[in-house]
Amino acid sequence: MVLSLQTLAKKVLAGQRPTKCHPHFLKCYGLWWHNGPMIFDQNQKKIWSPIFTDGVHINAALVKAVAENNYDLIKLFTEWGANIDYSLLSVNTERTRDLCRELGAKEQLKQEEVLYYFNIIKRNLTSSNIILCHEVFSHNPILETINRTKLRGIIYEQLEALMENTDILSELLTKYWYGIAIEFNLTKAIHYFYQRYVHLHQWRLMYALFYNNVCDLHELYAKEKIRMDMDEMLKWACRKNYNYLTIYYCCIVLGADINQAMFHSIQFYNIGNMFFCIDLGANAIEEGKTLALQKDKSFIASLLSINCYSMNDSLSLKETDPEVIKRMLKDYHSKNMSIAHKYYIKHGFNDI
């Protein structure tokens, strides 16, 4: 596409630092969005504005402009290289649909194209983009028209055990975006969801426990005073293997029963967690072996039959700062798992 002189001028101006440009000129050139200057980086193909402080890809910015029925920006972003077909993800009026059609948009997207664009847009793991995705997609009728099984599969990949059996797609998608924000510690997005979805405070606590996010766990429990039954917290921490950070926080910082954490880990067949609990001081080995046999987990029972496990004295049990805990356990290898592994290599477990 050959750009007009005016479009080129806007492109150059949008690439300047806002402090170098007077607001009046930016407004005249249509480079004022969300009550502030808009910046465009043509190399990264990203747009910045007061609500997109991390920047979003120009195709995502187009989706937002279409949702807002901002005709000038729809034209401008298309001239700057945005794919006009992305507009069909959020078009909500006939007038906007006509404009997008004039700019070259298809009549409609196929199911595979909707899912493809959905996956492309959500790849940018920043607060700005995740908030945009939530606002555009969580209550979007276009997602009601596509294959539910495929979409729920995408959501399940993120939520796993935290995915509830509900037919309300908007609720699942809200948790989906919230979960991404928590997993990747997107502070601004987390704050955004926290302020708007009070009923999800405990769900966020479960998510932090399940996904080993000790910083968010500390934020919720120590600062925000969000509470739930301690045994339930242990179950969520032990449900996913190698959740060393949240198991440590629950047992060492909050005082949960380390033997109970070991029992939960056995029930979930999470051997890494089980050995970590022994490293921390769990000593109900015989009870754990009995539980493993009751639950038909014979391999774990065999592991617990080795009478040579002990607490890891080199592991500090005094840390309470989540950042210190993260550093301490970043590359942690379980002492007792190593013992079991060496025993297995030398003797096997057939004769236990």
Curated annotation (Swiss-Prot):
Gene Ontology process terms (BP): symbiont-mediated suppression of host innate immune response; symbiont-mediated suppression of host JAK-STAT cascade via inhibition of STAT1 activity; symbiont-mediated suppression of host JAK-STAT cascade via inhibition of STAT2 activity; symbiont-mediated suppression of host type I interferon-mediated signaling pathway; taxis
Record's protein name: Protein MGF 360-9L
GO cellular component: host cell cytoplasm
Family the UniProt entry places it in: Belongs to the asfivirus MGF 360 family.
Signal peptide stretch: none
Quaternary organization: Interacts with host STAT1; this interaction mediates STAT1 degradation through apoptosis. Interacts with host STAT2; this interaction mediates STAT2 degradation through the proteasome.
Induction profile: Expressed in the early phase of the viral replicative cycle.
Physiological role: Plays a role in virus cell tropism, and may be required for efficient virus replication in macrophages.
Keywords: Early protein, Host cytoplasm, Host-virus interaction, Inhibition of host innate immune response by virus, Inhibition of host interferon signaling pathway by virus, Inhibition of host STAT1 by virus, Inhibition of host STAT2 by virus, Interferon antiviral system evasion, Viral immunoevasion
Compartment(s) where it occurs, according to its Swiss-Prot or TrEMBL record: Host cytoplasm
